[in-house]
Amino acid sequence: MLEQAKVYCIDIAAYAVMSNHFHAVLHINQAKSKGLTDIEVVQRWHQLYKGTLVSQQFERGEDLREDQWILLRRNIDEWRSRLMSISWFMRRLNETIARLANDEDECTGHFWEGRFKSQALLDEKALAACMAYVDLNPVRAAMAKTPEESQHTSVKKRAEKAKEAYSPNHPQQQVSELLNFAGNPKQDMPEGIPMRLTDYLELVDWTGRQIRENKRGSISECEPAIMHRLGIDAEHWLYITQNFESEFKGVVGAVNEVKSKISCFWDKQKERRRTAGIKACKLRLS
């Protein structure tokens, strides 16, 4: 997954690989995709697929006819789009895993039960909650006592790197394969996750302890400071970091953001327009 992300214009914010499934929080890096030159697009695509005879000639530096240029430019536009497509990213990743598993088991046929499921995260609250939900998979499954003891998770990789770093919140001292934590920037669209790495690690550690100790109705008063900045009630936070997938359907974020992003549909039985997922977002993230 991490190696494939280097080829695609997809950033990995969080991941957890379990025994029979995996979770990932992904960021589409449109600026990176648009900034690629034509030859860079072709080179990246050839790391994934064979491309075409014309694209192979182009990469070798051979002269092309005008009709070949027309065809190549059309392919480059399509490949540039695919390099920042989560669908194509997951398609390639699942194909690779299935091929390796089938080779290991010496069999053929379908490896995955169905297509992957995805949800759009619209704001910092939704992002933080989903990342924590993903990173805490092994803790919830009682496979690890703490996030740092878990295997094959982004939080373990980040925590190990942070212990070695002189300044763990500095982007250049964070895990290079993962999307950086950008601190608490004032601008609306920071380059990275809009919080400090150390705050997130503290938040996930605290959340993991609450889950492990099953503290329902007796939440510790020592809540991480970032909880107050995010503006999420502690009980709601603990609930959604254990039930994110079942609680939210589709787009996740503040109610006004969700309403502006997702399409409404007509419910003929109740004769009113409704928006999927609004109730859960209003209850848990307001």
Regions found by a protein language model. Give the residues of each.
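Short catalytic/metal-binding and nucleic-acid-binding patches
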Residues: 1-286
